Structures are given as structure tokens and as C-alpha cells.
Amino acid sequence: MATKIRLQRHGRKGYAFYHIVIADSRAPRNGNFIERIGFYNPNTNPATINLKFERALYWLNVGAQPTDTARNILSCEGIFLKKHLLEGINKGVLSEADAKSKFEAWKNVKRIAIQNEINKIYEQQRIVNKAKLESERVVNQTKTKVLAQKEKLLKEENNTPLPSE
């Protein structure tokens, strides 16, 4: 049976999220699947990916073909790198310790890059919020000045005697 690793659409209109599933290649997009191996939410920044690493690696090793988007997701999670390193171990090119250290180094670099991206997003959000707060403060100050002037004018009108008829 030809199996595919692909995305199954869920969510509402305009806010889709996806389950990463193993399915028969002839099954419809949201039809029956063999196994659900993960979750992908592109609506968050950065996108949220939750994946059963060992199961995805197993299905790749037994011949499941990922779709283009699923391939990108698996690649971002390091599954193709792990598969490549395991093939190197089987051929005798790499030792298991070397493969493990290379994978851990890649994982740490990836984790740092993601954390830097998150920090950059938070910093931009903080700057935007600070600018909004400052503009709101200026608007409130001008409003209070205008109200003070109006109150002053009303007091002056009340203090002046009315013209007699």
C-alpha cells in the first residue's frame, strides 16, 4: 500500500490548522488515515509544530512519501537529518556518538534561532505598544487642556453679570 505523510485540514474558515497524518495515497484529503503523528498551526508566530518524532522517522524509513508541505515541516523538525545520519551509521561512515553529537548540535542551533526570532517578535510588539501608549498619553493631555479651557470659559460666563433688560 502506498502511504503518504500529509496534512489534514481542520479549523474554521480563515483559521485553519492541520493534523499531520499517515494515510493511504488514494484516500481523500480529510478521509481515513492510518496514524496521526502530529499537529501544525500556521496561525501562530512562529508556527506551532508538535510532532511524534520517532513515529515520523519510522514511517519515512518504511517508505511513506511526504507531500511538499509535510516535507518542509519534517525538515524543520530535523527528521530528514536524523534519517540521513542513521543511514551513515548503517553504512559505517559515522559512529553513533558522532551522529548523536551532530544532531544535538543542529538541534541547539535551531532552538537558539527560534528563540531569537521569538525575542525579536516580542521586542517589536513592545515597541509598538510603547508607541501606542505614548500617542494615547498625548491625546489625553490635549483633551484635558481643552476641557480645562472650556471649564474656565464657563466659570467666566457664570461670574459675569447678565445684562439687564
UniProtKB/Swiss-Prot annotation:
SUPFAM superfamilies reported in the protein's UniProt record: Ribosomal protein S16
UniProt keywords, alphabetically: Ribonucleoprotein, Ribosomal protein
Gene3D superfamilies: 3.30.1320.10
Annotated GO CC locations: cytoplasm; small ribosomal subunit
GO molecular function: structural constituent of ribosome
Domain of life: Bacteria
Pfam families, A to Z: Ribosomal_S16
The keyword Chaperone is assigned to this record: no
GO biological process annotation, one example: translation
InterPro entries associated with the record: Ribosomal_bS16, Ribosomal_bS16_dom_sf
UniProt record similarity statement: Belongs to the bacterial ribosomal protein bS16 family.
PANTHER family: 30S RIBOSOMAL PROTEIN S16, SMALL RIBOSOMAL SUBUNIT PROTEIN BS16M
Name assigned to this protein: Small ribosomal subunit protein bS16
